Amino acid sequence: MSFDQILLPGILRRRYQRFFADVALETGESIVAHCPNTGSMRGLAEPGLGVYVSRANNPRRKLAYTLELVDAHTSLVGVHTGRANILTKEAIAAGRISQLLGYGEIRQEVRYSKNSRIDLLLEDPSTQQCCYVEVKSVTLRQGDGAACFPDAVTTRGAKHLDDLAATVCSPRQRAVMFYLVQREDCRYFTPADDIDPRYGAKLRSAIEQGVEILAYACQVSSQGIQVTQSLPIHL
């Protein structure tokens, strides 16, 4: 995925009320940017970090700027969680996810339980096989290069695991939790048990019930983000 415009560099002054970020652009202008990330952004919200923002051309938007990338020194990090589904769909369609080859159709935001929609539904009409893919954007790096999720307690994330596990009811029906690590400096993926032990327990239970776990790293630059390679899973 290439950004459709040139990103503007700046310095993060503060992130507050979850969805707002004060940024000093390199031009000297101070702006308020939308922060499209509901997590804690642990390690990525400290004042003084370098950032990149995009500017919308829509005059009706209350905030013209959106926080896109944070410079974590060892890697640029994509913090726009809304881009995770786009990146994953693009990678699947391009055949870069070896474990998800062979599906002719990809649909987004398909209802699959009473109160949930799946991020991506892969289908092969010729064999009637399908694969439910829930995508999580991972930005937290800990310890010796572990990509960790979640970065804050998430009851919603635990519910998604329960919903996924409930779909594994036929050999023709797969369920995949896909962790998209939007940074380049991680060696493996592991659940963040120190932050949300309940989520880690739910993840291990879902695996026992047939849910598959995939984690992929990204190459991140101010020009765009590309899904690159599979990461080992440490449970």
UniProtKB/Swiss-Prot annotation:
GO molecular-function terms, A-Z: DNA binding
Domain of life the protein comes from: Bacteria
Segment forming the signal sequence: none
InterPro entries the UniProt entry points to: SfsA, SfsA_C, SfsA_N
Short name of any one Pfam family annotated for the protein: SfsA_N
PANTHER family per the UniProt record, alphabetical: SUGAR FERMENTATION STIMULATION PROTEIN A
Similarity comment: Belongs to the SfsA family.
Protein name as catalogued: Sugar fermentation stimulation protein homolog
The organism's taxonomic lineage, starting at the top: Bacteria, Pseudomonadati, Pseudomonadota, Gammaproteobacteria, Chromatiales
Gene it is expressed from: sfsA
